[in-house]
């Protein structure tokens, strides 16, 4: 079987690094959708992908989505125009959603039963907290690096990815390390993080201060005085050292989350000038300031803007400022405003259970992060060997946030008798705008060689992972937010990690 994910490894893909800077917010209203969603058209021969890059062009088809599927005709169709039925079901998907904490220390005993329970509950993210208090004044030992690599591999084997946090003091005391020691530790961690990038979509900035939340540092990495004071100037220099070390040593495919928007505002006056540093709010929906997260409304506006392209996650809390904004109206409004991508399922329990009692927990779970919906597909129903096939796919992202991990849309032809599969890929699906109310169209071109096997081929669509370690594992494929058709022609295959469209191509 030949698959696009096998042909384009992450190292050779044109999907990373991301393009920046982005359009300023003041200009966004004047920029048409054609400028916001980049299309990579890929030309492929049957059986081998020839290119992973290409030109750009997109349009938005009118009235896409919401129509029942067509059935396969008794004779091969000359041209297919297929539509798909959206679904509001809460489909678990990688790189997004509620996360679970199965162990206090990620390097402690592996809780296989707890991880399995999390998987069965629909979780696809684990909290991975790594305690470094024993090495505040020393290099990390090889044994720790090896154990971290082992735990990340165990997460992958369980079908899970992680949101990673390194800290020296998970208490209010804030007994952390110096910025130079933190930088050295990150340099040591770099090879392990790079080798396991496939399972680390999110990482809190961590390391500094109490709970790794960048406040109350005992090593001068934070301050509480006036910004112009000497101690605060020194703390800012230390924070920049750690920020730069994070950017240099954490894989570019991993979203980094800073605790406070004030830091991002000092570093990047334009919220759209960078895309790697997002936010984690660990007292989400708690009081007027989210318990010190925001100093004023301008910081909330900045957070809403920066998370258009960088990830926002965290947890709610029970012992913060009052009132706690724990109603369904609160989470549905602020989840969308801040493009919420990942959130603690276990804390605060009173808040999460409250959403369930009020009847919105399933919707929060379904729309947190990205949510890709197929609207329509058009392609010829017949093709001669040696000809080029063009597939046009209309889809949209109706989730609260965009995709942050590189992904391509893959079209596959599966021979109905032999089962042979041929694939081609296109697009950088991170560029699909979130909360979309109209669809974007991606065009894929596939050249059929003279040696192509004749016969009827089913057309499938999928979004596999791009990393070698996970590309062929259907558990890491993105499930579309579409219902199976009642006639059985359109259906998601759990075993294959892709969607049968109900259309065919007769190759002759």
What is the predicted role of each segment?
Residues 202-209, 213, 217-349:
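Catalytic-core regions of glycoside hydrolase
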Residues 69-124, 129:
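Boundary/entry segment of secreted carbohydrate-active catalytic domains
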């Amino acid at each position: 079987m030949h698959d696009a994910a096998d042909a384009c490894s992450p190292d050779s893909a044109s999907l990373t690094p991301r393009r920046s800077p982005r359009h300023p917010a003041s200009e966004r209203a004047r920029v048409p959708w054609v400028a916001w969603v980049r299309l990579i058209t890929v030309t492929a021969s049957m059986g081998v992908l020839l290119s992973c890059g290409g030109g750009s062009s997109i349009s938005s088809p009118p009235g896409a989505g919401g129509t029942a599927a067509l059935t396969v005709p008794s004779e091969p169709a000359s041209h297919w125009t297929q539509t798909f039925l959206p679904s509001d079901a809460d489909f678990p998907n990688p790189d997004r959603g509620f996360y679970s904490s199965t162990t206090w220390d990620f390097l402690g005993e592996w809780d296989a039963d707890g991880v399995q329970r999390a998987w069965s509950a629909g979780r696809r993210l684990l909290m991975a907290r790594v305690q470094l208090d024993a090495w505040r004044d020393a290099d990390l030992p090889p044994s720790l690096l090896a154990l971290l690599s082992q735990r990340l591999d165990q997460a992958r084997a369980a079908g899970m990815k992680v949101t990673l946090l390194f800290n020296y003091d998970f208490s209010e005391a804030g007994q952390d390390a110096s910025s130079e020691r933190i930088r050295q530790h990150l340099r040591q961690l770099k090879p392990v993080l790079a080798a396991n990038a496939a399972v680390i979509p999110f990482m809190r900035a961590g390391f500094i201060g109490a709970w790794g939340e960048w406040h109350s540092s005992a090593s001068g990495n934070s301050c509480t005085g006036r910004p112009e004071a000497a101690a605060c100037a020194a703390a800012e220099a230390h924070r920049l050292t750690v920020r730069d070390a994070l950017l240099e040593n954490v894989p570019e495919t991993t979203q980094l989350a800073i605790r406070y928007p004030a830091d991002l505002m000092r570093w990047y006056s334009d919220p759209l000038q960078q895309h790697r540093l997002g936010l984690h709010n660990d007292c989400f929906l708690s009081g007027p300031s989210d318990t010190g997260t925001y100093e004023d409304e301008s910081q909330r506006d900045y957070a809403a803007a920066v998370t258009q392209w960088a990830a926002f996650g965290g947890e709610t809390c029970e012992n913060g400022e009052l009132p706690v904004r724990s109603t369904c109206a609160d989470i549905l409004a602020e989840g969308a405003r801040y493009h919420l991508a990942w959130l603690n399922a276990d804390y605060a329990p009173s808040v999460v259970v409250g959403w369930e009692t009020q009847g919105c927990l399933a919707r929060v779970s379904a729309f947190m992060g990205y949510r890709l919906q197929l609207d329509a597909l058009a392609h010829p129903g017949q093709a001669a060997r040696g000809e080029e096939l063009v597939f046009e796919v209309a889809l949209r992202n109706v989730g609260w946030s965009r995709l942050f991990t590189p992904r391509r849309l893959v079209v596959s032809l599966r021979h109905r008798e032999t089962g042979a599969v041929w694939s081609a890929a296109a697009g950088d699906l991170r560029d699909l705008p979130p909360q979309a109310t109209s669809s974007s169209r991606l065009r894929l071109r596939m050249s059929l060689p003279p040696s192509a096997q004749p016969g009827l081929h089913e057309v499938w669509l999928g979004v596999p992972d791009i990393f070698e370690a996970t590309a062929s594992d259907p558990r890491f494929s993105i499930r579309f937010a579409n219902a199976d058709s009642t006639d059985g022609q359109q259906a998601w295959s759990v075993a294959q990690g892709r969607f049968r469209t109900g259309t065919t191509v007769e190759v002759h």
